[in-house]
């Protein structure tokens, strides 16, 4: 199996004027080009969200009989805090390693809602 891409998605779910923060969900989705894969809990990776690292282990899913496809392998929902002027661009990076597959990384960023101050 060859993993060809790791896409990072960032969604702003809500924001709080009182806390000067946003609630976001980050996801990492792999795309593969060929092969069969049974992770059986041996895949692992991490998301780094706004400088904080979140580890994922025991990632399990099966890919069988597909020439290509994609699967979301990591998801995390967190609160991030804005600058004193209410602005915030959140940066995210991701790493994934599966059984008998290559390691792959991805990254992304999103300008969040400017919170009125």
Where are the model-predicted features located?
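Mature extracytoplasmic or otherwise solvent-exposed domains
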Residues: 1-117
